[in-house]
Amino acid sequence: MSQAIVVAALYKFVTLEDYVELREPLLKTMLDNNVKGTLLLAHEGINGTVSGTREGIDGLLAWLRNDPRLVDVDHKESYCDEQPFYRTKVKLKKEIVTLGVPGVDPNQAVGTYVEPKDWNALISDPEVLLIDTRNDYEVAIGTFKGAIDPKTETFREFPEYIKANFDPSKHKKVAMFCTGGIRCEKASSYMLGEGFESVYHLKGGILKYFEEVPQEESLWDGDCFVFDNRVTVRHDLSEGEYDQCHACRHPINAEERASEHYSPGVSCPHCWDSLSEKTRRSAIDRQKQIELAKARNLPHPIGYNYKAEA
């Protein structure tokens, strides 16, 4: 790869009794290796996306894997020319991905992991119910052929969607997927608790599928939304053509950018008629700051605010 920046999405569900104490040494390791991005720590594990040089990412991964609990931390890599993150953060959370249902613990019960090479065969089975566990704006960018879109705005809405639409006695086989594997892994734990018997989820998520399955064999249609400045990636993990509205965070394509309702950093066709005047003024001021920083060839810290896969 000629591109200088490595982007690593990583997570692991593992009991971290000392997650509060881990924050400072983890942050120091990221800073020492000049790694940017955000990692989330909770009692149930670690999650996040970071970026840096090859040496920097390797240094962080080596530090993490020196802890026996994180020796097999799941991570996927892609590459880009510029830093997709401006800040370095480690946040303490109740959950590393927020489902909001007490007692759901992938460390105790989880569905069957399916390797990317075996995914096509599974989802081609007509008896398998294929569910995209991501949010509506992500699904709109791309999904697996034949997948059901729950049309949820946040992962918190997923449990109610399942309760309202599916019956464990009728839906015997369920397969789920998400960007990096974390949401569908937690969703599988929830589904088992609800009585669904055969629950499968894509190991490593869409990004691992892109990495390991040749494009000519792919059952994916479209791009994949990612939680950094690239906005989307294609099947070859190169940066997609989408931008992102800084007002509503919705991905926008070339046609939407040509709309009369699109104003860079201020509004887009998805939000122009719903923004309050206060929000609009704030967005205009922020965009001026971003453009000023760009003119001075400086990164702007509010050009993108990291949001964990959720």
UniProtKB/Swiss-Prot annotation:
Protein's recorded name: tRNA uridine(34) hydroxylase
Enzyme's top EC category: oxidoreductase
Domain Rhodanese: 124-218
Keyword Chloroplast included in the entry's annotation: no
UniProt-listed Gene3D superfamilies: 3.30.70.100, Rhodanese-like domain (3.40.250.10)
E.C. number(s) listed in UniProt: 1.14.-.-
Pfam name, any one: UPF0176_N
Organism: Pseudomonas putida (strain ATCC 700007 / DSM 6899 / JCM 31910 / BCRC 17059 / LMG 24140 / F1)
Function field: Catalyzes oxygen-dependent 5-hydroxyuridine (ho5U) modification at position 34 in tRNAs.
Keywords (A to Z) from UniProt: Oxidoreductase, tRNA processing
Recorded GO MF terms: oxidoreductase activity, acting on paired donors, with incorporation or reduction of molecular oxygen
